[in-house]
Amino acid sequence: YKVGRMEGEQSTDLQEAGKPIVSEFERFAQEHGRQLHLEIEPGTFFVANAGALIASVMDIVDTGVDGYRFLKIDSGMTEVLRPSLYGAQHPIVVVPREDEERASVEYLIAGHCCESGDVLTPEPDNPEGLQTRFLTEAEIGDPMVIGGSGAYCAGMAAKNYNSFPEASEVILARDGSIHLTRKRQTLDQVLENEELPAHLT
């Protein structure tokens, strides 16, 4: 069940997708005198766009006229592996800390894992390629929202890569209240399963 994360991406029309199935089920019932019960699990379709990752801009690097402007953030494949794995696209928005008008600037976004593949702006369907995005001009410390993160993000991330702790998660309720659903890991929790053999102590 394709769900469009980016502007212009088409999502599956569930009504259209179901029409051929309905007619086949009706035909089966007429021919065999019994009705079939079908259950589907379109989980991603329902929750992908219900979640967002909030990161912060940690550094801004300009590699010159023939290079790129990079935004380095305090997140990456430890929370959203999809871009690095298969060139998946996620909507990204820089949120200025100050209420001011800023220009639009072309950026590549790099994660914090010290991996050449930890990039949140690959070419579509090509994790080996790079594709810049026009975003609001960023400053160090600005928050960044990475949308479409409600499915196949935390659940398939490179957890604890480079000993980064698992991020906290919250739910934003209908009334605007925020509720913690998972605490951020401590370093002790990251290391708790490590054992040092006796002969090395």
Report the location of each language-model feature.
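Well-ordered, non-membrane alpha-helical segments in soluble/globular domains
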Residues: 8-24
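Charged (often Lys/Glu-rich) extended helix/loop segments that serve as interaction or gating elements
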Residues: 20-22, 26-201
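Active-site-proximal beta-alpha loop/turn segments in soluble metabolic enzymes
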Residues: 1-13, 42-46
